[in-house]
Amino acid sequence: MSVQVENLEHNMAKLTIEVAAEELEKALDSAYQKQKKQISVPGFRKGKVPRAMIEKMYGAGVFYEDAANILMQQTYAGAVDESGVDIVSRPTVEVTQIEKGQPFIYTAEVAVRPEVTLGKYMGVTVTKIDTSVSDEEVDAELENQRNKNARTVTVTDRPVAEGDTAVIDFEGFVDGVAFEGGKGENHPLEIGSHTFIDTFEDQLVGKNTGDEVEVNVTFPEKYQAEDLAGKPATFKVKINEIKAKELPELDDEFAQDAAGVDTLAEYKEEIKKNLTEKKETEAKKTKEDEAIQKIIDKSKMDLPEAMIETQCETMVEEFAQRIAQSGLTMEQYLQFSGMTVDQLKDQVRPEATTRIQSSLVLEQIAKEENIEVTDADIDAEVEKMAKAYGMEADKLKEYMGDAEKESMKKDIAITKAVDLIMDNVKERAKAKKKADAEESTEE
């Protein structure tokens, strides 16, 4: 295998990867072995048709696509190592030559880690944040806990109201025809959650158990299912049950049940302590974000588009994993929200860009400050992770590959860089706009 590197504009590069003809022949045979059981030829049993016969009937390129995929999977990682390019995106690949008896050649366009020229990062000024907790905040959290500890009861003496959960059967129609994904039975729908499109939920308010109603809505103009986008729809809905929350009394008994303390007064003190800790944690993160953003604003880097696109895709994948834990597929989420995958990627793009910029400047600070990650640092992080997973640290370390260890090492270095920045920040009370502008020009 040989690899040639061509540097392109805006921190992009093109790798041209050439694989020996012998390796292509092996991949073609692997593709044949994979596909032969699905190919039928008169006079031969399935799986027994000679490769030459299949190529004669369907053309010499019948196995090219599978063979190309096999070879790219086998060779890409090695080609990246051989190139020495610090790649920070998924590749855009193109096969430029595939022919029996000839070398297999393909290209991969990739983003290259951009160089970072740091601005001022020591002595950055951040806004001081008040972390005190008021009595009103304690009361609001108490009310929140009452809602969490509420019983769900079936309501029979009144119609659907805001905040209720209506258990419904529904079926949707466009132009009188039922559409795919528009039917459900005994679906619990919280009124006011805006889970369903348009004014669907509003039209159930005031209806009683057993009512069969027609709900008229319009799908958003930009909707995942293009055949439904912008169209009016009618849903036939039956209300099977109305459920409401019954809140517990705010007394010592509630405090005992909710928090295991003796009195409501003790519970309030515990809530105040927890809220204070939460505020302090949030304040720390907010000040870190402010400091890092100021460093980003004063630094220079040219982010390749492919790097941002890869980060957007990663964040959408992470989101899909999170909603899957609640039993919702990405397809269902997109249908309910009226969004497309591209719109979701556009939505996360600003955060994706900030994540990349933060990572790049912090890695550069770690490099310029000669921040070291010791074996003890790694052991401590493994210990923390093992505790979170309920595993033995040694076992977890055995499962970790080189890539995971390298990623952990990078994360620890970034954390140390953040600590260094925050150890040297200057705090100031929130200033007026004029003072803010003057302070900004100084940094």
From Swiss-Prot:
Transmembrane segments: none annotated. Keywords: Cell cycle, Cell division, Chaperone, Cytoplasm, Isomerase, Rotamase. SUPFAM superfamilies: FKBP-like, Triger factor/SurA peptide-binding domain-like, Trigger factor ribosome-binding domain. It comes from the Bacteria. Coiled coil: none annotated. Its EC number is 5.2.1.8. Its main location: cytoplasm. GO terms for molecular function: peptidyl-prolyl cis-trans isomerase activity; protein folding chaperone; ribosome binding. It catalyses: [protein]-peptidylproline (omega=180) = [protein]-peptidylproline (omega=0). GO terms for cellular component: cytoplasm. The keyword Cytoplasm applies. The keyword Cell cycle applies. It holds the Pfam family Trigger_C. It is an enzyme of class 5 (isomerase). GO terms for biological process: 'de novo' cotranslational protein folding; cell division; chaperone-mediated protein folding; protein transport; protein unfolding. HAMAP family: Trigger_factor_Tig. Belongs to the FKBP-type PPIase family. Tig subfamily. Involved in protein export. Acts as a chaperone by maintaining the newly synthesized protein in an open conformation. Functions as a peptidyl-prolyl cis-trans isomerase. This is Trigger factor. It comes from Agathobacter rectalis (strain ATCC 33656 / DSM 3377 / JCM 17463 / KCTC 5835 / VPI 0990). The lineage of its organism: Bacteria, Bacillati, Bacillota, Clostridia, Lachnospirales.
